[in-house]
UniProtKB/Swiss-Prot annotation:
It comes from Thermus thermophilus (strain ATCC 27634 / DSM 579 / HB8). This function is generally fulfilled by the C-terminal part of HisG, which is missing in some bacteria such as this one. The keyword Cytoplasm applies. Keywords: Amino-acid biosynthesis, Cytoplasm, Histidine biosynthesis. Pathway: Amino-acid biosynthesis; L-histidine biosynthesis; L-histidine from 5-phospho-alpha-D-ribose 1-diphosphate: step 1/9. Heteromultimer composed of HisG and HisZ subunits. HAMAP family: HisZ (MF_00125). This is ATP phosphoribosyltransferase regulatory subunit. InterPro entries: aa-tRNA-synth_II, aa-tRNA-synth_II/BPL/LPL, HisRS-like_core, HisRS/HisZ, HisZ. NCBIfam families: PRK12292.3-3. The keyword RNA-binding does not apply. Required for the first step of histidine biosynthesis. May allow the feedback regulation of ATP phosphoribosyltransferase activity by histidine. PROSITE patterns: AA_TRNA_LIGASE_II.
Length: 361
């Protein structure tokens, strides 16, 4: 009936999905993030990071198009010529499509993201703002979450200073990210590495925990740029004033993320609910942001099994118009409204301008 990897949502889940998206949009708007609307179709770019997994189409002129596979790159292309100096705040929401999606709640090929971008601002205060909104997003949804913060740029600076050939650097980065110490030791044995760099590289996978991890990292012979990145992270966390889980061996896309990278998890659910970070220079001179996966959030929220009943059962259109402005109201179609209301737990009936309790009917 529908393609594999897509979903048909009935009212309980569709309603909750709309509420989740609406709460996030309202939260971001309150913090100055204005909405933008992006086209679902874009010109196909073979250099796009998700080009191989995008749905491609050909129009009647022969031009190759692609369904939107992520928001940040497209937003950067469209905004680059329109922004002046200073900080700019944007939010987005909508569906994305991937032809070969990663295994996630099955294999979704159509999924929804809500996210934000802070452009034109950098430094600890800007990073703290984005992190604070990640916490606030989870709180707005009533999701108990733990935010994990990494510093891929630190790993990148250590690898650059190691003198390893580029191919070995990439393999070492993957081993550090996976915390595979035996593999990392084997890679370092393939090429001469200064003892100080070797010591730092072997320590990175174990730099995981609370703020005490920063003290451990400061005790290592880090190259100057890595020391600077660590100091920036410490200042960011001081400004944030919230507990986070630090993973200084997190090396995901270190060539893309120029500063922090973070993601959030909730107990009993193994996939990250959100992810983001700072990517100065990748698409904008100064940029940071994050996105939340709505389908993952819905799963983590453990959907209610039963649909929430309306507050009012309207017996005519006049009552529907009158009370739907203030309460959740449903128009009745049938022969016995009292029995129907009692069965569904609807507390009020309405006729015209009159509202009365079911037990009084």
């Amino acid at each position: 009936m529908i393609p594999e990897g897509t979903r048909f949502l009935l009212p309980p889940e569709a309603r909750l999905k709309a509420e989740v998206v609406g709460k996030l949009q309202h939260l971001f708007r309150r913090h100055g993030y204005e909405p933008v609307e992006l086209p679902a179709l874009e010109l196909y770019d073979p250099d796009h990071p998700l080009a191989e997994r995008a749905f491609k189409l050909v129009d009647k002129t022969g031009e190759v198009l692609a369904l939107r596979s992520e928001f940040t790159t497209l937003l950067a292309k469209l905004l680059r010529a329109h922004l002046g100096e200073g900080a700019h705040r944007f939010q987005y929401a909508g569906p994305l499509w991937l032809r070969e999606a990663d295994a996630e709640l099955g294999r979704l090929r159509e999924y929804t993201q809500v996210g934000l971008e802070l452009l034109g601002a950098t430094g600890p205060l800007a990073d703290a703002e984005v992190l604070e909104l990640a916490f606030a997003a989870l709180e707005a949804l009533g999701v108990q979450g733990e935010v994990e913060v990494g510093l891929p740029s630190l790993v990148g600076e250590v690898l650059k200073a190691s003198g390893l050939p580029e191919a070995l650097q990439r393999r070492a980065q993957q081993a550090i990210h996976r915390k595979n110490l035996p593999e990392l030791k084997g890679l370092l044995a393939e090429s001469p590495v200064p003892e100080e760099a070797r010591k730092v590289l072997l320590a990175l996978p174990d730099l995981y925990g609370g703020r005490e991890v920063l003290k451990e990292a400061r005790g290592l012979p880090l190259p100057p740029k890595a020391q600077e990145a660590l100091a920036q992270l410490e200042r960011t966390l001081d400004l944030l004033g919230r507990p986070v889980l630090l993973d200084l061996g997190m090396a995901r896309r270190y060539e893309y993320y120029s500063g922090i990278f973070f993601r959030a998890y909730t107990p009993g659910f193994g996939l990250p609910l959100l992810g983001g970070g700072r990517y100065d220079g990748a698409l904008f001179p100064k940029a940071a942001g994050f996105a939340l996966g709505v389908e993952r959030l819905l799963e983590a929220l453990r959907l209610p099994k039963e649909e929430e009943p309306p507050e009012v059962l309207a017996l005519d259109l006049k009552a529907l118009r009158r009370f739907a402005r203030e309460r959740r109201t449903e128009l009745f179609h049938g022969e016995d409204p009292v029995a129907y209301a009692r069965r569904r737990g609807i507390p009020f009936l309405a006729r015209g301008e009159e509202l009365f309790r079911v037990e009084e009917a």
